[in-house]
A protein has these predicted regions:
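Conserved substrate/cofactor phosphate-moiety recognition/catalytic segment
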Residues: 3-60
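Conserved beta-strand scaffold positions in the cores of enzyme catalytic domains, especially
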Residues: 9-10, 23, 98-102, 158-160
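Conserved phosphate-donor/acceptor-positioning beta-strand/loop module used by diverse small-molecule
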Residues: 92-115, 161
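Short, amphipathic alpha-helical "lid/cap" segments that border enzyme active or binding sites
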Residues: 52, 56, 168-176
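Conserved nucleotide-binding/hydrolysis micro-motifs of P-loop NTPases
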Residues: 15-17, 29-30, 74-76, 104-109
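C-terminal alpha-helix
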Residues: 174-185
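Small-molecule kinase domains that catalyze NTP-dependent phosphoryl transfer to phosphate-bearing small molecules
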Residues: 116-171
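Glycine-rich phosphate-binding loop used to anchor ATP phosphates in small-molecule kinases
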Residues: 47-101
Length: 186
């Protein structure tokens, strides 16, 4: 299991391609759930979490090469770490290796990436750029979305990468090298 936390997960598709693994982007369950329920309805939360939990259980117990899960983590909330630890524990109980990759980028770069063609293609709710940018600003003010430099996090296999100026290929290679993971042979 690879958990991509932070707010700069542009690297995931390349990394996913290199490793032949499944991808559960946090927005996948959100995009589906928002078509059925308003975000404020309790059913929205129940369905969203049920989708994720089911995917986690199927991948943890199945014979799959892996799963990448991207997640926006509020580093100032213990419940976020508890949630991620529960996901990690599920995979570890099924003899899977787990890795946590924190990706961060400057806010201005995140605004640019938020408008990218690929992001808008795959994330319908982000197509309202005015709303999306306002939501980014509000979320960044309300939560601490990255760890502090030198902060000790409760993850066994962890790396933090500032990918503000890095290409996705570079970041994917850094992750593979750091964790000594072989990728696809071209």
């Amino acid at each position: 299991l690879f958990i991509g936390i932070g707010r700069a997960c542009i690297v995931v598709p390349k990394f996913q391609y290199n490793l032949f693994v499944g991808l559960l982007d946090i927005r996948m369950s959100i995009e589906l759930t928002r078509k059925l329920f308003a975000h404020s309805e309790k059913e929205w939360s129940v369905l969203n979490e049920t989708i994720r939990k089911t995917v986690f259980e199927l991948f943890a117990k199945g014979d799959f090469p892996g799963l990448i899960f991207t997640y926006m983590c509020a580093f100032d909330m213990q419940s976020e770490f508890d949630y991620l630890q529960n996901v990690i524990d599920l995979f570890k109980s099924n003899d899977s290796n787990c890795y946590v990759v924190e990706l961060c980028a400057d806010f201005e770069e995140r605004l640019v990436r938020n408008k990218s063609e690929n992001r808008l293609l795959h994330k319908e709710s982000k197509r309202n750029l005015e709303w999306s940018e306002a939501e980014m600003r509000k979320t960044s003010e309300k939560y601490r979305l990255n760890s502090y430099d030198g902060e000790s996090l409760p993850f066994e296999n962890y790396i933090k990468i500032d990918n503000t100026t890095l290409a996705p290929d570079e970041v994917a290679k850094m992750i593979q090298t750091h964790f000594a993971i072989e990728g696809r042979k071209e």
